[in-house]
């Protein structure tokens, strides 16, 4: 049975309302200089004031495509180095990249995140530290390399999960 016939049979007794094709356009402000905008915002960030000379800073980077991601990372790393900190990248992406250390480095590479461009190491490992338990009794773990850093800064795009809805879906909560 063809799809059309199936739908006609299923909807035979259903009265459908009239439909109209509509399109919604929203203004999307553009940053013309993302590096300058980020540097300006970080000047006012109280958390950045806590980072001192020789502190290690794990920059948690996910697998989501973010416009200007490498520029964002490059700017943040430059500011951290100016403070005398020792930044490094940790992949923060769950099962992406085949849930392997090299696979996750490869995902970052395809997003333009490389040790050569950013001048810092990408420290990828599947080792974790258990930091507690959830209210339901499940272990809560985090990347071991990030756990041992003095500070963690996630770079993330926050969006709804594509497969399910719930109070905790994807992205930033998983990264932390």
Predicted regions and their residues:
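Histidine-anchored nucleotide/phosphate-binding helix
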Residues: 67-87
